[in-house]
C-alpha cells in the first residue's frame, strides 16, 4: 500500500511514549516492593535495608526510575505540545527499557531467593521487563534511530 509505512511509523512514534510510561510504572512498582521488603525483612536482628549493599541496590533502583520517568515525560510532553518528538521518543524507549530490566535485576539482589518464587509479585515484573525490552524495537534499534534523528 502506497504511503502505508509513513502512517504506521507515525502511529508507532505515538505509541512508544505510552510503552515507556508503562515500563516506568513497572520500575516504580519494583522500587516500592523492594523498599517495603528491605524495611520488613529482619536479618541479624536488624532490617536488611540498613545494610550498605542493600542500600546500594535501592539507590540504583531510584536512579533507573528517575531516568525512565524524566525521559518518558519529556517524550509525552513533546508529542502533546506538537514539537518534534523523534529524538525524545527513541531516547525514552532506550532508557525505559534498560531501566525496567536493570531495576528488576537490582530488586532480585535485594530480595535474594524469595524473588524467584512464582507466587511472589517480582517474577511478574521480571518477565514483563524482559518481554517489553524488545517490544517495538530493542534499545540498539532505537539508538540507531536516535543517531539518525540527531544527524550522527
Where are the predicted features?
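Alpha-helical interface subdomain recognition
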Residues: 10-152
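Long, acidic (Asp/Glu-rich), low-complexity accessory segments flanking structured domains
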Residues: 1-6
Amino acid at each position: 500500500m502506497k504511503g502505508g509505512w509513513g502512517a504506521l511509523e507515525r502511529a508507532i512514534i505515538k505509541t512508544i511514549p505510552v510503552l515507556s510510561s508503562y515500563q516506568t510504572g513497572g520500575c516504580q512498582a519494583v522500587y516500592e516492593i523492594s523498599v517495603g521488603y528491605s524495611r520488613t525483612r529482619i536479618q541479624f536482628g536488624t532490617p536488611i535495608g540498613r545494610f550498605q549493599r542493600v542500600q546500594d541496590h535501592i539507590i540504583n533502583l531510584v536512579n533507573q526510575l528517575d531516568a525512565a520517568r524524566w525521559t518518558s515525560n519529556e517524550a509525552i510532553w513533546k508529542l502533546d505540545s506538537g514539537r518534534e518528538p523523534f529524538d525524545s521518543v527513541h531516547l525514552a524507549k532506550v532508557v525505559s527499557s534498560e531501566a525496567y530490566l536493570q531495576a528488576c535485576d537490582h530488586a532480585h539482589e535485594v530480595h535474594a531467593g524469595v524473588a524467584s518464587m512464582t507466587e511472589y509479585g517480582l517474577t511478574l515484573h521480571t518477565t514483563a521487563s524482559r518481554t517489553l525490552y524488545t517490544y517495538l524495537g530493542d534499545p540498539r534499534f532505537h539508538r540507531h534511530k536516535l543517531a539518525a534523528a540527531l544527524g550522527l
